[in-house]
Amino acid sequence: MARVTVEDAVNKIGNRFDMILVAARRARQIAVQGKDPMVEEENDKPTVIALREIELGLVTADTLDADERQTVREREAAEIAAVAAIAEGRNAI
């Protein structure tokens, strides 16, 4: 079992409350959304992996925001393409 001290992560983010929010968002990305960890997993849980990524400066609130904006843009582009394909199919009839 990995022992993680959060002091380095707190220092990277600024305060404990924001660190918790960032760690939770990143852990959710890893566990639920299937995002790849940026550090070795070492049989750790997603929350521990998220804290290690924060400690190393690999993850910040800004990087998570940018990643989410990119995901939204990709999803919207896919939806627009799907609607265009449907409309094109109707026009062909």
Swiss-Prot record:
Signal peptide: none annotated. InterPro entries: DNA-dir_RNA_pol_omega (IPR003716), Pol_omega/Rpo6/RPB6 (IPR006110), RPB6/omega-like_sf (IPR036161). SMART domains: RNA_pol_Rpb6 (SM01409). SUPFAM superfamilies: RPB6/omega subunit-like (SSF63562). It catalyses: RNA(n) + a ribonucleoside 5'-triphosphate = RNA(n+1) + diphosphate. Gene3D superfamilies: 3.90.940.10. It is an enzyme of class 2 (transferase). GO terms for molecular function: DNA binding; DNA-directed RNA polymerase activity. Promotes RNA polymerase assembly. Latches the N- and C-terminal regions of the beta' subunit thereby facilitating its interaction with the beta and alpha subunits. Belongs to the RNA polymerase subunit omega family. This is DNA-directed RNA polymerase subunit omega. It comes from Shewanella piezotolerans (strain WP3 / JCM 13877). The gene is rpoZ.
